[in-house]
């Protein structure tokens, strides 16, 4: 199993400030998969309190991987736009409680969409 890897990734995510900020991808030469570095949190399912930033940043990492692999700069630009939207949202406290904001998961996602549309 990867139990110790899971434990270490959770601990390092906490050092970074929140499990909700630990982005990752599993990548090979042909395929990649975006996922937040931490496990599921069934105890908060459906409560609108989960931090979506780790999954959004994981998607950004996947876009970068694909853009580099295929030589497609527009995918890398999309990745940068996602990362910039997350950075700006955190600075404006448009985030969930674990990041110092007062928004729920849905509202945080909507704030990111507004920043991407601007």
Where are these regions (language model features)?
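Glycine-rich phosphate/nucleotide-binding loop
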Residues: 1-81, 85-92
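Glycine-rich phosphate/pyrophosphate-binding loop and the adjoining helix
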Residues: 72-77, 81-118
């Amino acid at each position: 199993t990867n139990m110790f890897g899971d434990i270490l990734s959770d601990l390092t995510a906490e050092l970074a400030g929140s499990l909700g900020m630990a982005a990752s991808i599993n990548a090979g030469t042909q395929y990649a998969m975006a996922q937040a570095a931490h496990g599921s949190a069934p105890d908060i399912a459906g409560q609108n309190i989960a931090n979506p930033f780790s999954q959004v940043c994981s998607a950004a990492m996947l876009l970068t991987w694909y853009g580099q692999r295929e030589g497609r700069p527009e995918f890398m630009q999309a990745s940068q736009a996602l990362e910039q939207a997350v950075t700006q949202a955190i600075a404006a406290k448009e985030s969930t409680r674990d990041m110092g904001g007062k928004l729920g998961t849905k509202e945080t996602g909507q704030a990111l969409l507004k920043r991407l549309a601007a």
